[in-house]
């Protein structure tokens, strides 16, 4: 395994919901927070063995599941405010995210590849948000 080889990397996937909480799905947020913490514990345990452990936290990723959730939200808007889903969702995303666009699965994959590479050789125990600026720690 990784410890026997004295090198390797693990990348966990969590969510920004694990950092800021979710009013609509507290169990999801709690499980993602636990994921982040578990990865940090592993990072401390495995660093002396040359194994790096990091976490990627996606934000608003444009996936079929997220689109279904957002469409359901859109469909509950008051009558008379009818706008296309695309216009409505685009406005919401631009208001929520400083970079003003959905993340894509490729955005998340690119960070996982980076963290798995030698370019990230000095990174362990880190939680990296790929979220268009949604969560900013000052």
Description of each model-found segment:
Residues 20, 112-113, 124-138:
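Short C-terminal tail/terminal secondary-structure segment
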Residues 15:
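Residue(s) in the substrate-gating loop at a strand-loop-helix junction
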Residues 52-62, 116, 129-131:
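Conserved SDR Rossmann-fold cofactor-binding beta-strand/turn motif
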Residues 31, 39:
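Active-site helix of classical SDR
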Residues 44-48, 121:
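Alpha-helical segment proximal to the catalytic Tyr-Lys
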Residues 85, 97-108:
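A conserved structural motif in NAD(P)-dependent oxidoreductases
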Residues 62-96:
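A glycine/serine/threonine-rich, flexible loop-to-helix segment
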Residues 21-25, 47-48:
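Active-site "substrate specificity/gating" loop of NAD(P)-dependent dehydrogenases
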